[in-house]
Amino acid sequence: MSETALDLARALISCPSVTPQDGGTLGVLESRLKASGFRTHRLTFHEEGTPDIDNLYARFGSGAPCLVFAGHTDVVPVGTATDWRFDPFAAKVEDGQLWGRGAADMKGAIAAFTAAALTFIEQHKDFKGSIAFLITGDEEGPSINGTIKLLKWAAEQGEHFDHCIVGEPTNPQVLGDMIKIGRRGSLNGILSITGKQGHVAYPHRADNPVPKLMRLIEALIGTPLDEGTDHFDASNLEVVALSSGTDAYNVIPAKAEARFNIRFNDLWTPQTLELELLARLDSVAEGTAYTLTFEPCNALAFITKPDQFTDLVANAIEKQTGRRPELSTTGGTSDARFISAYCPVVEFGLVGQTMHMVDERVSVADIATLETIYTSILEGYFP
């Protein structure tokens, strides 16, 4: 590994960029890219009720094909800083590890790809094609003023991407474990029933909505939504909260509601899920009036089917680690869901065991290997 990758990772981690703060991270990255000939654009996106977010777009070259790297420089809060072995923004190197908030998720990967890209450009000055960066400060937050708007802006400028790598920490245990080739969708909903409040000693004067809610919940979770597909696990509806608006033991509540989340595969859309849930509820409602509402969904299921590009990435990983990575769609959502509407996308970064945790850290050796993997991908992509 050139010192550039580790130095850049430390410089990025040293910037306290807890969403929505940038902390100077984009300036650090932009200066490196500009110095190597990238055209850069800093963009601040706005939306009422949300914080303004800074974003960075950079591109070297103008021809096709274009390989774009996408990532986020924002990080989650550190919690109690004194619980950490080292200052979470000191970017300390100790015991062969780089310590700090964002080391795994995902400043280490941004640094590794940047170092790989700069070295590749220096060694292949006349390569045919383009390398681009989509970097946001709004991935750990509401994801409203980040990648989704950056992609729209790029399309309006006539920018075209052929393939994308997202530097999420995809490896559960060791580097080379896993490539993400898709993600499940995510849909939030609320099921509510209105009854009549009353004293528990006089139930005939009230209408308790809780037993009715329990019966309807059973209709939602009693039968699996599906059995999964070739690339996805079965879809899952998980009830995450129950409430009735009162903590008193002697009061029958006037209203009861259940909040739930569905992680769904490529057999479903938010619209077909809504129809399925309504059909299940109506089959057992027996005259019970209910309300079923959903939050707006910006997390659809997507898949990049295995092809030459996924083989290129997998081969580069196997060459450097000796492991053939699993092609997976497990885990939560990421900004890859937005990118999938523009080009095929895969995710591969560092090991994610400590992401979002106290004492987040990554192996310095893994940063070196990841840089080499990214370099191998670039060399295979632009022969």
Curated annotation (Swiss-Prot):
Gene Ontology biological process terms from the UniProt entry: diaminopimelate biosynthetic process; L-arginine biosynthetic process; lysine biosynthetic process via diaminopimelate
Cofactor, how bound (note): Binds 2 Zn(2+) or Co(2+) ions per subunit.
Cofactor(s), by name: Zn(2+); Co(2+)
Origin: domain of life: Bacteria
Pathway terms, separated by semicolons: Amino-acid biosynthesis; L-lysine biosynthesis via DAP pathway; LL-2,6-diaminopimelate from (S)-tetrahydrodipicolinate (succinylase route): step 3/3
Protein's job: Catalyzes the hydrolysis of N-succinyl-L,L-diaminopimelic acid (SDAP), forming succinate and LL-2,6-diaminopimelate (DAP), an intermediate involved in the bacterial biosynthesis of lysine and meso-diaminopimelic acid, an essential component of bacterial cell walls.
Protein's UniProt name: Succinyl-diaminopimelate desuccinylase
Species the sequence originates in: Beijerinckia indica subsp. indica (strain ATCC 9039 / DSM 1715 / NCIMB 8712)
Lineage: Bacteria, Pseudomonadati, Pseudomonadota, Alphaproteobacteria, Hyphomicrobiales
